């Protein structure tokens, strides 16, 4: 009789531990899904986000509005580099080939490559075939972080 109670108690402890681990795993998964990219720096006052969801093919366009006092954050952030005359054409090429017409809200796409200037800040993540890329461009004149993502 004592032995049966010990087995039952052990089974209940295992079940409780399994439930706790399941809850922890769910919390981790949910927090990972809702977290933004490291390149989207906290402190923006407003944002406009346009996503075209697909199973594997999707296009994103977002704008994050900052105050002028936030400019220094981009300068000090390790994810960002400064736009120079040597890399400006490469950065512009990603925006030029960005297929915004495929977006559900294509009329919301208002980015002009003339907005890219030396002294702005950018971060670029690109796949090997140019079929997957993310570009983050912080325009120091307008204090807007532009984000485009293309995955086909």
Where are these regions (language model features)?
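Generic hydrophobic/packing signal
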Residues: 27, 32-34, 39, 118-120
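Sec-dependent bacterial lipoprotein signal peptides
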Residues: 1-31
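Intrinsically disordered, low-complexity segments enriched in small/polar residues
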Residues: 1, 9-10, 41, 52, ...
């Amino acid at each position: 009789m004592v032995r049966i109670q010990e087995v039952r108690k052990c089974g209940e402890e295992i079940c409780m531990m399994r439930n706790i681990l399941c809850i922890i795993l769910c919390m981790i998964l949910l927090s990972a899904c809702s977290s933004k990219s490291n390149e989207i720096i906290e402190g923006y006052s407003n944002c406009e986000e346009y996503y075209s969801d697909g199973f594997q093919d999707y296009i994103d366009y977002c704008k994050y509005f900052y105050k002028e006092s936030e400019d220094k954050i981009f300068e000090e952030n390790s994810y960002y580099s400064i736009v120079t005359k040597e890399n400006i054409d490469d950065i512009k090429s990603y925006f030029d080939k960005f297929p915004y017409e495929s977006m559900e809200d294509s009329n919301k796409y208002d980015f002009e490559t003339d907005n890219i200037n030396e002294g702005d800040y950018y971060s670029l993540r690109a796949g090997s075939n140019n079929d997957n890329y993310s570009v983050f461009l912080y325009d120091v004149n307008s204090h807007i972080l532009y984000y485009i993502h293309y995955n086909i």
